[in-house]
């Protein structure tokens, strides 16, 4: 993730397999609820420093009061951990003893644009091209966490791979009372983003290799005026620096053949000109605290869903189908 220009602070940035659904449920009950249920679940453990080597790589920089998509990778001994059974605990840390307020499973979503360690790049004509080696980020863990007030919270992540021991990682986060980026249910900014017809060279507004003209045909404001749903991806493909940034533009591209006749797919670069110098006007209008982001905007111009950081086709397609009223 590139650094913000001077004066603009930037935050840091299918079900997991086991030996059956019963073991997954048993693990969740054991590590999330503890022997005494949600009210008593070893809240004191959250006050102890983590002593193991499990390191979370959080891709969600903005948490707000309400429900949140909390996405993260897990690093162990220098490698990203895939397909583990994972749960997340949320603690109120305002008192001397942290109080457990919620416990949720985290589902591992495998990236559909990674095959055998190589990055699958979708060209505008529909052909597939393998680039290698890909990042070792082949998927992402997602938990949906509730925060009922603004301020500090404690997060405990518990992970178990196969029959191995339960490993933990702990961190503190802050829930905002008011979001910076637009929330679902609010009107989308009526941005007049640059499109292909505005530039002599498409690479001026798309750092993908090669640039994809399908993602630069429609202005956000025009789609709203026409009552056309949108999938808008804010990303800088060439300069994705974070280990878990992921090929989000390629994930979006995979949906165009199926939904392109009903949905406007739009890509907006983060920077106007050289990276790190100035944000594009559309990015400033959307007040994004990080990148990448994907927003779904319905035919009324309301935001239906938002995804920060690494996102999989399965998550995105489910949201698109819901927006279109499809089963």
Task: Report each predicted region and the residues it spans.
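N-terminal secretory signal peptides that target proteins for export/translocation
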Residues: 1-18
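Bacterial N-terminal signal peptides
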Residues: 20-34
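Contiguous segments within soluble domain cores/interaction surfaces
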Residues: 44-205
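Thiol-/selenol-based redox modules, centered on thioredoxin-like
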Residues: 181, 304, 308-327
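Short active-site neighborhood of thiol/selenol oxidoreductases, capturing the structured segment around
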Residues: 201, 212, 220-240
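Thiol-based oxidoreductase modules, predominantly thioredoxin-like and allied folds used
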Residues: 234, 260-276
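Typically the conserved alpha-helix immediately C-terminal to a functionally engaged Cys/Sec
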Residues: 242-259
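Thioredoxin-like thiol-disulfide oxidoreductase module
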Residues: 269-291, 296-300, 322
């Amino acid at each position: 993730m590139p650094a913000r220009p001077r004066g603009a602070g930037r935050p840091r940035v299918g079900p997991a397999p086991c030996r059956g659904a019963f073991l997954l449920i048993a693990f969740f009950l054991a590590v999330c609820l503890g022997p005494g249920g949600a009210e008593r679940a070893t809240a004191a453990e959250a006050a102890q420093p983590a002593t193991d080597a499990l390191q979370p790589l959080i891709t969600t920089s903005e948490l707000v009061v309400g429900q949140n998509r909390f996405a993260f990778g897990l690093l162990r001994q220098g490698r990203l951990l895939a397909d583990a059974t994972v749960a997340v605990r949320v603690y109120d840390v305002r008192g001397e003893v942290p109080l457990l307020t919620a416990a949720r499973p985290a589902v591992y979503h495998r990236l559909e644009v990674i095959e055998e360690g190589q990055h699958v790049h979708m060209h505008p004509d529909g052909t597939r091209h393998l680039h290698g080696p890909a990042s070792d980020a082949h998927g992402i863990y997602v938990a949906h966490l509730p925060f009922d007030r603004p301020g500090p919270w404690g997060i405990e992540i518990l992970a178990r791979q196969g029959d191995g021991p339960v490993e933990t990682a702990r961190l503190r986060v802050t829930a905002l009372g008011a979001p910076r980026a637009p929330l679902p249910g609010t009107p989308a900014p009526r941005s007049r983003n640059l499109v292909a017809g505005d530039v002599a060279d498409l690479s001026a507004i798309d750092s993908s290799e090669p640039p994809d003209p399908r993602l630069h045909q429609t202005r956000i404001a025009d789609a709203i005026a026409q009552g056309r749903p949108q999938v808008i991806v804010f990303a800088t493909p060439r300069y994705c620096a974070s280990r878990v940034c992921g090929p989000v533009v390629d994930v979006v591209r995979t949906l165009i053949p199926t939904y392109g006749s009903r949905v406007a797919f739009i890509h907006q670069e983060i920077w106007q000109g050289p990276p790190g110098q100035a944000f594009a006007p559309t990015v400033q209008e959307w007040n994004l605290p990080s990148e990448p982001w994907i927003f779904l905007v319905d035919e009324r111009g309301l935001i239906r869903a938002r995804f920060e950081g690494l996102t999989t086709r399965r998550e995105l397609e489910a949201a698109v189908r819901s927006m279109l009223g499809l089963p």
